[in-house]
């Protein structure tokens, strides 16, 4: 049994770039050593054998907890999911093998969150967890320093590549002649994710739809259902001035 035990458990709470990241790990390392758990109730997940979808129901969360006990090391790709935070808060002995992979927004919630009783309680839980982590994986050393300053953590710092870098692909985009081009190109978002507030941005830009603008939406990553919704709304609002990038 010990021989088949997964060494490294990756827990994702944010879906951008997941497929490419998983493919990169499986291609360059032994896939049998890695298990990827994605905490989501929506969208499809990678169909690889070492990828599982974990929903909010009790039985799924039991699977998550079981895998957290079985593995050697845990990589937390984002510290936002409240159920994951509660699991770690009430089972703090798991923190000694947890490494937080900083996404950015999960660190800066310290500054960006709206003050309320629930928000304060949420931050108390996060503070306890971050303070007692084994390691923090951050591409930017300053992010690690901020985590130490804000959360008084003694976690070790581990340098890592920025998510897209190892899975970089070149894509051919049309060249724009700035001298003769009469349009202003506006990029909205960088993935099909509700957190990027595409619809709100569309509303603000709608009053300019008859001007010389073109809207470009990169939607190669993220949720399929949300992607379709954005494409439909973009075409309805901007017509042939709306462009998408759905494949890389």
What are these regions (language model features)?
Residues 1-3, 162-183, 195-196:
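Acidic anion/phosphate-binding donor-loop and adjacent secondary structure
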Residues 10, 175-196, 202-205, 215-217:
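Conserved donor-binding/catalytic core segment of Leloir-type glycosyltransferases
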Residues 10-11, 63-84, 97-99:
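Short N-terminal targeting/anchoring amphipathic segment
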Residues 65-70, 116-136:
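Membrane-proximal helix-turn-helix segments that form the acceptor-binding/catalytic region
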Residues 73-75, 92-112:
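Active-site proximal beta-strand in glycosyltransferases
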Residues 104, 142-143, 158-173, 221-222:
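Short beta-strand->alpha-helix junction loop in the catalytic core
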Residues 126-158, 166-168:
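A short, active-site helix/loop in glycosyltransferases that binds the activated sugar's phosphate group
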Residues 228-248:
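Nucleotide-activated donor-binding/catalytic signature segment of Leloir-type glycosyltransferases, i.e.
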């Amino acid at each position: 049994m010990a021989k088949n035990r997964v060494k490294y458990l990756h827990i994702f709470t944010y879906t951008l770039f997941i497929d490419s990241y998983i493919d990169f790990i499986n291609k360059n390392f032994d896939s049998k050593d890695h298990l990827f758990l994605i905490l989501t109730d929506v969208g499809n997940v990678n169909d690889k054998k070492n990828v599982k979808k974990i929903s909010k129901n009790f039985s799924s969360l039991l699977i998550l907890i079981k895998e957290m006990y079985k593995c050697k090391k845990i990589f937390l790709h984002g510290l936002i999911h409240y159920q994951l935070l509660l699991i770690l808060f009430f089972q703090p002995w798991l923190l000694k093998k947890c490494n937080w992979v900083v996404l950015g927004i999960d660190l800066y919630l310290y500054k960006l969150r709206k003050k309320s009783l629930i928000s304060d309680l949420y931050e108390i839980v996060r503070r306890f967890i971050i303070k007692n982590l084994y390691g923090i994986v951050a591409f930017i050393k300053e992010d690690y320093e901020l985590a130490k300053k804000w959360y008084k953590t003694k976690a070790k710092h581990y340098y890592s590549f920025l998510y897209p870098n190892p899975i970089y692909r070149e894509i051919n985009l049309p060249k724009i002649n700035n001298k003769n081009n009469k349009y202003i190109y506006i990029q909205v978002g960088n993935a099909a994710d509700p957190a990027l507030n595409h619809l709100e941005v569309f509303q603000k830009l709608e009053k300019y739809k008859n001007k010389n603008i073109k809207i470009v939406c990169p939607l190669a990553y993220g949720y399929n259902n949300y992607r379709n919704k954005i494409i439909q709304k973009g075409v309805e609002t901007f017509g042939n001035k709306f462009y998408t990038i759905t494949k890389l």
